[in-house]
């Protein structure tokens, strides 16, 4: 079966003055439809770059990243943009952008502009998804400027889910300080994926975010190691190459 998302020998470097920073080194992975994949790694391990490549926001220097069998590097920037607004949704908890004078329901509804829905239909879908993530009718009418971190994170999830993606990519999805709020959010995320038969690719330095995933991977020093055994993390030894600096 063709994987929904695949990396094959992907390498990514970033220029830094006269040097090149090696971020990902010959990474290969597969994410199949309806399967959840977790990537555990410390800061600057390469996991955020991995997710940017998976979403088509960035392209590899070598190797291939394919979605549904199609190489993203062969797509136009417009095609990748439409993919990211449709079949793929990307969420990062520290990437909150909202009009402070906009209501929560309108903030979610406006993300559906490419779906061909009327505004009434968009608002109806937004209200339904907000309810599913624990934001009731009253909360949906609040202004986005009034939301705390926990509420913003749930609204961001609703905005991602409203587009009904095949693959949801999450980078450190829950940064709220309260452990109970984080655990509640992770449980909500897993339930949403199951109910929608949606694939997940989640990267975090917090193991709680990765509980219950089907495949758990570890990234360190730009290299990825995987195991098919649920709940097992394989850590790679740190390794530096002469003349190459690593950055996540």
Question: Can you name each region flagged by the protein language model?
Answer:
Residues 164:
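Conserved catalytic motifs of ABC-family nucleotide-binding domains
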Residues 55:
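Helix-to-loop junction immediately C-terminal to a conserved catalytic motif
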Residues 72-88:
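ABC ATPase NBD coupling module
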Residues 121-138:
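Conserved ABC ATPase "signature" region
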Residues 94, 101-113:
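Q-loop/switch helix immediately C-terminal to the Walker
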Residues 63-71:
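Conserved ABC transporter NBD signature motif
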Residues 143-149:
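Conserved ABC ATPase signature
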């Amino acid at each position: 079966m063709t994987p929904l998302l695949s990396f094959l020998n992907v390498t990514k470097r970033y220029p830094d003055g006269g040097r090149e920073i090696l971020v990902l080194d010959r990474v290969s992975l597969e994410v199949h439809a309806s399967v959840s994949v977790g990537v555990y790694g410390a800061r600057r391990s390469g996991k955020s770059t991995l997710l940017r490549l998976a979403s088509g926001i960035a392209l590899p220097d070598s190797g291939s990243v394919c979605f549904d069998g199609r190489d993203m590097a062969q797509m136009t920037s417009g095609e990748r943009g439409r993919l990211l607004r449709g079949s793929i949704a990307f969420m990062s908890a520290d990437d909150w952008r909202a009009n402070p004078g906009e209501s929560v329901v309108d903030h979610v509804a406006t993300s559906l502009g490419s779906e061909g829905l009327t505004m009434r239909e968009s608002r109806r879908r937004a209200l339904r998804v907000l309810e599913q993530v624990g934001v009731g009718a009253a909360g949906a009418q609040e202004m986005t400027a009034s939301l705390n971190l926990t509420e913003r994170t749930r609204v961001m999830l609703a905005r991602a889910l409203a587009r009904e993606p095949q693959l949801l990519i999450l980078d450190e999805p829950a940064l709220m300080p309260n452990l109970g709020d984080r655990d509640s959010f992770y449980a909500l995320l897993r339930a949403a994926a199951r109910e929608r038969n949606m694939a997940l690719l989640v990267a975090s330095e917090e193991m709680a975010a990765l509980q219950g995933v089907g495949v758990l991977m570890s990234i360190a020093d730009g290299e990825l190691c995987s195991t098919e055994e649920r709940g097992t993390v394989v850590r790679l030894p740190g390794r530096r190459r002469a003349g190459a600096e690593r950055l996540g």
